[in-house]
Every structure is written in structure tokens, then in C-alpha cells.
Amino acid sequence: EGAINIETNGVNGVAIGAGLGGDIRIEKGRYDLYINGENGVAIGSISTPVNLNLLQADIDITYEAANGVAIGSVSQHADIAIKNTSISLRGSGNRYVAVGTLDGDGCSVDISRAHVDMNLKGNSCIAMGSDHGIADIRMTDANSRLAVQGEACFALGSRDGTGMLSSNNADLNVVVRNSLNIDISAAEQDIRLVNGRYMFILNNENIERKVVERY
């Protein structure tokens, strides 16, 4: 339950995890991670699938690598669960994903009773999701603030449009500035919002989405 500080730099760097991936479980404690260099991972894997569980932790990440992922797998599928955890993530790079996979066949991201605050800039970046395949994102009793800025950047989903967002009783605030004119890369019928508070701003325009109220 102490504090861990890790800084990576170089061609390929992983702060917590390994190039070979596998199961990674982080429970309790504070983690301050600074990622720099050419290809970087804060928590996860470079070349294999990863199953990540972040539980009851306080995680602060500064991601400044040119390419890679902050939390997840660079080149394979990533299953990520974030529960009772606080994550603050600042990103600046060329091509990267904050939570998910960059070149894998998709990802699942399950956020429950957690707080996630992201401020991302880059040429091609994604807050939660993947460049390819299905990105299945679920939020329950979560508080998320996602600010994303860059030519080919967006907040949630999969770059090929096969993302899915299911949110229940969440407080979700999304602000995106890009040239894609997309904030969530998913079909609107695959965006399901139940209860909670939601705000979506794309290129200074407010986007209204249906929120189902169930009490």
C-alpha cells in the first residue's frame, strides 16, 4: 500500500508488466508513472494479449512516448477492468491509445466505481478503445472526464467504427477537438446510456444523445 515511482525511456519501455504480457493485477497503493521514448507502455504488454485488473489503486500517468499504449497491449487483444480506482492520465505523442490496444484485434474496458481523468493530445490518439476490431467499453457508477485533441484523435470506440459503449449511472464528460468530426467511433445504436449525467462536446458543438432513465 505504499507509493511506486517509475520512469521509462528508450526504444521500447514497459513500466509495469512485460513484453510477454499475461495476467496483471494491481491492488491498492499509489503509482506515479512517466513514459517517454519511441514505443512505451505504462501498464501492460507490448507484444502479447493482456488481462489487466486495476483495483483500489491511485494511478497517475504522464505518457509522452511517440507510440504505444498507456494501459493495455500494443499489438494484441486487451481485457481491462478498472474498479474502485482513481486514474489521472496526461498524454502527448504521435500514435497511441490511453486505455485499450493500438494494433490488436480489439479490447474490452470495464470501469466500475472508479474515477478517470484524461487530457490527451497527439496526431492519432484514442482515450479508450482500439485502432482495429471491436472495442467494448462499459461504465458503471463511474466518473470520467475525457479531453482529447488532435487531427485523427477521438475519445471512445474503434477507429473502424465497431466500438460499443454501455454506460449505467455514470457521470461522463467528453470534449473532443479533431478533423474527423467524431467523438465516439461507434454506430449510434451501439451507444447505450442509462441514468447518470452525460456531456459530449465535439469541435465546440454540443452533441445530444438519448439517455434512458430507469429507477
Which ranges hold each PLM region?
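Surface-exposed loop/turn motifs in large extracellular/passenger domains
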Residues: E1-N36, G44-G122, M128-G150, G157-Y215
